[in-house]
Regions:
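Catalytic-loop motifs flanking and including active-site residues across diverse enzymes
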Residues: 13, 65-69, 95, 174, ...
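Acidic, glycine/proline-rich low-complexity segments that act as flexible tails and inter-domain linkers
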Residues: 1-63, 72-76, 80, 227, ...
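Short, small-residue-enriched loops and turns at beta-alpha junctions
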Residues: 23-25, 57-61, 87-89, 132, ...
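Glycine-rich anion-binding loops and their surrounding alpha/beta cores
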Residues: 34, 39-45, 101-107, 112-261
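Short, structured segments at the rim of ligand-binding sites
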Residues: 3-6, 20-33, 88-111, 124, ...
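Aromatic/hydrophobic pocket-lining residues that form π-stacking "cages" and hydrophobic walls in ligand
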Residues: 17, 69, 178
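Active-site-proximal beta-alpha loop/turn segments in soluble metabolic enzymes
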Residues: 18-22, 95, 156-164
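A generic, well-ordered mixed alpha/beta core segment in the N-terminal half of proteins
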Residues: 48-116
Length: 263
């Protein structure tokens, strides 16, 4: 991974490596090793953070209610660092597209991250601002025609060493691998299969939590909060996020999703 980050391989070698790793599937040990290589190249200052909140998937069936959960937690004093890799797939709604509307600070460097956390307890930063080599690998998705393991790796980074890392892995079988990788790194983590691949509990289904605390793995099963499934909206209207945040509308699905995600 160090050679990839330092630009010491050809583009064809990089693509071949990523696709081979995707085919064989990355192990917890490999993910932990890759993360160590990335962290050793970060120049992040010591900034106290409670939650590391990666946001790389985007939503397509429901609005990104997790953003309101993050805002509510920040308002209660929880310091949250969010990071993402841009709107890389058509037809999905990404965190970056809603930052201004929801008054979430978008930070270009670590100094503005620190200032935003001091003022708002919430800061977002684009991966390309602080690890451009990794962002370039994510951007190869359209060229390669496949999601590479870098999309998974970005969720483990926890670049500021938050007290707890949150991760959402949508594809079955990968959640435990991510939990184990974070455990190997000495991080406290909670991994879920969040709605759309984002850190958002779906209140209509049972949720399994894969955790690691102090190097000890644990599992929890959370029951569905709704007795029946909600009908998915015909379209995603960002104004509905704002209306719910202001208390102008009642909507059981996002209200339950917010409660479960904040818990």
């Amino acid at each position: 991974m160090g050679m990839l980050l330092d630009g010491k391989v050809e583009d064809t070698q990089l693509g071949a490596f990523l696709m081979l790793l995707r085919h064989k599937e990355e192990s917890a040990e490999e993910l932990a090793g890759f993360t160590e290589a990335i962290r050793s190249r970060l120049s992040a200052p010591a900034i106290q953070v409670d939650l590391d909140w990666p946001s790389y998937a985007g939503k397509k069936r429901h609005l990104p209610w997790y953003l309101l959960a993050a805002k509510a937690l920040a308002a209660s004093g929880v310091r949250i660092f969010m990071h993402g890799g841009g709107a890389h797939t058509a037809g999905r709604m990404y965190t970056e597209q809603l930052l201004e509307q929801l008054d979430i600070p978008s930070c270009d460097d670590w100094q503005t991250v620190e200032a935003a956390l001091a003022k708002h307890n919430l800061a977002y930063s684009y991966l390309g601002n602080w690890m451009p080599a990794l962002q370039r690998m994510i951007d190869l998705r359209n060229t390669l025609g496949l999601r590479s393991p870098i999309h998974s790796l970005a969720r483990i980074l926890n670049p500021l060493g938050a007290r707890c890392g949150l991760q959402s892995i949508f594809h079955p079988g990968y959640q435990a691998v991510h939990r184990d990788a974070s455990g190997l790194l000495g991080d406290n983590v909670i991994v879920i299969k969040g709605d759309g691949g984002e850190i958002e509990i779906n209140p209509d289904t049972t949720s399994h939590l894969y955790g690691s605390t102090g190097g000890v793995s644990w599992d929890e099963e959370w029951p569905a909060l709704s007795a029946q499934r909600h009908v998915k909206p015909a379209s995603l209207e960002p104004e509905h996020l704002l209306a719910l945040w202001r208390g102008d509308v009642e909507d059981s699905y996002p209200q339950l999703a917010l409660l479960a995600t904040m818990a």
